[in-house]
């Protein structure tokens, strides 16, 4: 696994020297990622590391339940660590900030302030949901699959 990682990392580096990196992942499908060599290298490096970490998780020996939990935890961590989740590394968000003269950043800060006031992150327009009309409440449990 180590030799494969170093071989792929070397290939990635060599491709970046010739500006021939093309990242094949929906999170990095915007032209902003591929037209910026630093962003493309960052995305490609992330994908290499993500594949390697998932490979390590798959290689864990043990019972199926433990292996599934490890895989799930690593998968969540890897997804959260994607450069598309951070403004400092997100080429598409940076381009939008430039194109909107910072308006997209201001809107994002407004959304953040609203979420802080609510005490949780909004994932959808909560005003569209009303208990008893289009949302039911029942007791339940979290199920790990």
Q: What is the meaning of each model-derived region?
A:
Residues 1-145:
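Amphipathic, low-complexity, repeat-rich surface-exposed segments
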């Amino acid at each position: 696994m180590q030799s494969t990682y170093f071989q792929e990392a070397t290939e990635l580096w060599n491709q970046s020297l010739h500006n021939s990196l093309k990242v094949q992942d929906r999170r990095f499908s915007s032209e902003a990622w591929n037209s910026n060599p630093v962003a493309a290298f960052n995305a490609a490096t992330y994908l290499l590391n993500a594949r390697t970490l998932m490979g390590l998780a798959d290689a864990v020996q043990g019972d199926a339940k433990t292996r599934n939990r490890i895989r799930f935890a690593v998968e969540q961590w890897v997804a959260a660590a994607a450069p598309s989740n951070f403004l400092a590394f997100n080429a598409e968000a940076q381009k939008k900030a430039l194109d909107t003269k910072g308006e997209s950043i201001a809107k994002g800060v407004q959304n953040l302030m609203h979420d802080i006031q609510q005490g949780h992150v909004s994932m959808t327009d909560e005003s569209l949901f009303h208990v008893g009309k289009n949302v039911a409440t029942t007791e339940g449990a979290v199920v790990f699959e």
